[in-house]
Amino acid sequence: MECGVATPAQLAAARAADGLSRAAPSAMGVDADAIVAFLDEVEAAGLELHSMMLWRNGQVVAEAWRWPYRPDRPRILHSVAKSFTACAIGLALADGLFRLDDKAVSFFPDFLAGPVDGWLADMTIEDLLTMRVGHASETSGAVWRALETSWVAEFFKIPIAQKPGTVFMYTSAASYILSAILSRVTGETLHDYLKPRLFEPLGIEGEAWDIGPDGINPGGNGLCAKTADLLKLGILHVQDGIWQGKRLLPEGWVAKATAPHGEPVKYGYHWWTRPDGSFSAIGRFVQMATSFPMYGATLAVTGAIRGSRHLF
């Protein structure tokens, strides 16, 4: 993605455009020295952090940008897209377009001529959200992008090795089928569905989402947006789906989406969860928004780091 050096005027313009308020760390009870120490440790460890924004109690209290990355330039967020997809599913459920226990196969009769495997027939929307689809192996975004045939058709060819709803296996195939289901019931792409319901109310502009061979957004990846947009996703969930006094996500949805489903992996509805109550949207190379409801805080970072464990 094309990048350039940001001038002070460009930085000021980007801050004004994102609609987020700023305050000194101390005003929000945040230790500025600890932030500097964190950034110093990242640098000393040789970790390539591209940007960082920290928000607490209504204010951005710290932000950092590594040359040549800029706050006004969208970047590929990789699997963070999954958490945006979860928002769309929550909205569609509230709209009565489908239910969590609806079977995935029921939306694609044209792809399933003949008998359907029993376990495949049992797979639900909730199984897709929690990545418990029973697939024998994971399917990454890179695998999807190499296919020029229908990704929906390919999904139904993946062998089912476990009963859906029982075993976690991280797979972008689940996210793609959620996007495909949404398109089937709305006649819109996932991106178009979210635009007036989420992106515009959050002040997210200039975002782009890839389209697969079926004319469907991948759901699990392919979304480009700014670091501030990533931060807003986390803030929205810290605030229980409310933005500037208006409810954007259905009441109760955030609690369901960020609660762990199953063991040993504590995964929600396309959100990674932790025992302390925090939760994260995470993309490859640490594109990440981690929300800490107990502190009223969200941290958004982007970078080229292999594994979030290197940061926390």
Where are these regions (language model features)?
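Active-site Gly/Thr loop motif
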Residues: G206, E251-L299
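A small/polar active-site loop signature that marks catalytic segments
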Residues: V133-I211
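Active-site-proximal alpha-helical segments within enzyme catalytic domains
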Residues: A174-I181, N221-I242, Q287-A304
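Short active-site loop at a secondary-structure junction
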Residues: A44-M53, R66-D110, D117-M123, K163-Y170
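A short, well-structured edge-of-sheet supersecondary motif
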Residues: L39-Y69, A289-T290, G296-A300
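Extracytoplasmic/periplasmic proteins that interact with beta-lactams or build/remodel peptidoglycan
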Residues: M1-G29
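Active-site SXXK
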Residues: G58, R75-D101, L128, L178-L182, ...
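Active-site helix/loop module of the DD-peptidase/beta-lactamase fold
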Residues: I76, D95-V133, K157, T186-A225
